[in-house]
Every structure is written in structure tokens, then in C-alpha cells.
Regions:
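FNR/FR-type flavoprotein reductase catalytic core
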Residues: 137-292
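Ferredoxin-reductase
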Residues: 55-152
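OB/S1-fold single-stranded nucleic-acid-binding modules
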Residues: 2-4, 8-62
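Local cysteine-cluster metal-coordination motifs and their immediate loop/turn environment
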Residues: 17-20, 24-41, 287-320
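Short acidic, glycine/serine/threonine-rich loops at helix termini
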Residues: 270, 296-297, 325-326
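Short Fe-S-cluster ligation motifs
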Residues: 6, 54-74, 314-330
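Short, surface-exposed secondary-structure boundary micro-motifs
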Residues: 107, 156-157, 306
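Short amphipathic beta-strand/extended segments with alternating polar/hydrophobic composition
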Residues: 114-119, 310-317, 324
Length: 330
């Protein structure tokens, strides 16, 4: 019998059980999905049902909002904003992991916060850096933030990257990181983790639609010199990118490819690897699903799959291939 391997990013953490478990919609626990038997989808060393019972059948306290002082604001170009702010030490530690993100707002209205991936979290200085692409109403509001002023953030959240298990298990291996556009920002914590585990990392960057590679400051600290090239051409993986990927995985025995960009880039890379018959290479990628509450309640991050399955991707940790296979568009 086929059993899908999925995980909940919050399972076993201080935020579990959450509102989903309280309402009978737990991602992992069968009994907290309405069943009368114990059949967890993925055992994490903690019984979520028991934790809920011990907590009076109520969800644990969820993420808090913090008011933080902005230490630096840089407008890299008209639509790219870099913000550095001071955070509590525990929050800085929690946000140092690959895939970490927060919700930011500059307005008192809680409906105006926007999910932003962490570029860097310095646990020595407690300075957190984020890079924001100005696209719509919510992100335009962030242009009003000034150095020395304050911003309100909510976090920590950790499901900004799919395939985290594939990243963590890499040790003394050769890794390829492919990034495009604002995907340059969330790739930095991933590269940092890979370098810490003594992996050799090759980075390909397509700066489009930006004017420059604005994460050079952090790549230099990691002794990473990225190769710049055009990755997408007419909505498809460019011939230049195909040649580079085929050459690098052929000569360097690549064990993991991390894709930091839009879903079209992830999909095209997976399709090309299938064409090369290289399903043996592990994958990880950015989580590009829309998010609003970050707790799986609002439904903004949900997607429907074959078999009438609904997945809440602000919490569901899956492999990059799984987020496209069997996905329904209506």
C-alpha cells in the first residue's frame, strides 16, 4: 500500500499542537483527523494527541508579535529593499535555520503583514536581515520604514523551503544552487548550512529582473563566487542553463540541487533532470505559496491534489517533486 511521506514543520516544536489539532485537522495525527486508531503519517518522537490532552485539549500559545528597532534601511533599487533590524536573541537563533521567514508590517492593522524570507540572522549581534521585492500594496507600505524607526514582526516560521531533510543530510558532498531574482535572498541561509557541513557549493545566479546580485556581501563571507547567466528564456529553461546544469552534475557528482526562484524555474529544472534520467539527485526549493496567517487556518496556502487531498503548505513539509505531482488546478 502506498503511503505518502509528508511532515509538519511545527510537529514536536513549542508551537505543537496548534489550532489545526484543536479543530480536528492535524496534518499528521490520525486521531486528530477524526479516526479511532493511531496511525501517524510521520512519527516525530512526540505524540501530538497526548500533548493536546495534557494541554487541556487546547492549542499551545502560538507565535508572538515583536516590535523591533530598524538598524539599517537600504533601497538597492526602486523595487528592492534591504532592512536590518534588532531582534530578541531567541528569535535570532530560531530564524537562523534554512527556510525561516517572518511576517512584517509597518502599519498597526494586523491584516497588512506580509511573509518575508530571512536573508541572514546573526546570532552574535541579534541583527536580522531581510530583502524585499516591492510588488504590491503590502510591500509598498514597507517603503515607509526608516532607519532608527520600528517595525512589527511575527514569527518564527520555518517552512520557507521544501526538501529541508535533503539539505540537512548533506555532508562532504558537492551541491549545486540555482537562484533567480528575489530567490537570491532565501538561498543564503541554505548555502550557509551546506558550507557548515563541509559541502562544496556551486552557485548559478540569474539576477533578472534586478540590476545586480544584491547578496554579494553574504556570499563573499562564505567564499562563494556565483556564476551569472540567464536561466529562463521564453518561459522555459534556457539552453545556456541546460548546458551548465548537465556539465556541472556530470563532472562534479552533484548530490543535491537547491532551486531558489519561481515555481516555473523549479518545475523546469525537475523536468530537465527527468529528461537526463537523474532522479537520483536530491532536490530542495523555495516555498512560493501565498500565505496570510501562517498557521494553516486561513486557507491562502492550500492546494488541492488528486484523491480530494488538500495540503496546507505553510505547514506541510514536502519534497519539491511532490508539490507538482497530482496537483489539481481547479
Amino acid at each position: 500500500m502506498f503511503k505518502e511521506t509528508i511532515d509538519c514543520i511545527d510537529a514536536g516544536t513549542e508551537y505543537c499542537p496548534c489550532r489545526l489539532a484543536e479543530s480536528g485537522e492535524c496534518i499528521l495525527c490520525s486521531q486528530l483527523q477524526g479516526s479511532h486508531f493511531c496511525d501517524c503519517l510521520n512519527w516525530n518522537g512526540v505524540c501530538i494527541y497526548q500533548e493536546l490532552y495534557n494541554n487541556g485539549n487546547k492549542a499551545k500559545e502560538q507565535r508572538k508579535a515583536y516590535t523591533c528597532k530598524v538598524s539599517e534601511k537600504v533601497l538597492c533599487q526602486d523595487d528592492v529593499l534591504l532592512i536590518k533590524f534588532e531582534a530578541p536573541h531567541k528569535l535570532a537563533i530560531d530564524l537562523a535555520k534554512p527556510g525561516s521567514f517572518i511576517f512584517i508590517r509597518s502599519d498597526e492593522n494586523v491584516y497588512f503583514d506580509v511573509p518575508i524570507s530571512i536573508l541572514d540572522s546573526n546570532i552574535d549581534t541579534n541583527i536580522i536581515s531581510v530583502m524585499i521585492e516591492i510588488r504590491g500594496v503590502k510591500t509598498k507600505q514597507l517603503l515607509n520604514i526608516e532607519s532608527g524607526g520600528e517595525i512589527t514582526i511575527r514569527g518564527p516560521y520555518w517552512n520557507g523551503v521544501f526538501g529541508l531533510k535533503n539539505i540537512r543530510k548533506q555532508k562532504n558532498n558537492n551541491i549545486l544552487v540555482i537562484a533567480r531574482g528575489i530567490g537570491m535572498a532565501p538561498m543564503v541561509p541554505v548555502i550557509k548550512k551546506l558550507v557548515q557541513n563541509d559541502n562544496k557549493v556551486t552557485v548559478i545566479v540569474d539576477k533578472q529582473p534586478f540590476n545586480d546580485v544584491y547578496v554579494s556581501e553574504w556570499l563573499d563571507k562564505l567564499n562563494i563566487v556565483p556564476q551569472e547567466m540567464n536561466l529562463i528564456e521564453k518561459g522555459k529553461l534556457s539552453p545556456e542553463a541546460k548546458v551548465a546544469i548537465k556539465s556541472i552534475i556530470g563532472y562534479n557528482n552533484i548530490s543535491l540541487i537547491h532551486i531558489a526562484g519561481a515555481d516555473i524555474l523549479t518545475y523546469d529544472v525537475i523536468e530537465y533532470l527527468d529528461y537526463l534520467d537523474r532522479q537520483d539527485i536530491d532536490l530542495s526549493c523555495c516555498n512560493n505559496f501565498k500565505m496570510c496567517c501562517g498557521e494553516g487556518v486561513c486557507g491562502a496556502c492550500t492546494a488541492r491534489f488528486s484523491g480530494h487531498r488538500v495540503k496546507r503548505f505553510c505547514k506541510v513539509q514536502a519534497s519539491p517533486r511532490a508539490i507538482f505531482e497530482g496537483r489539481r488546478l481547479i
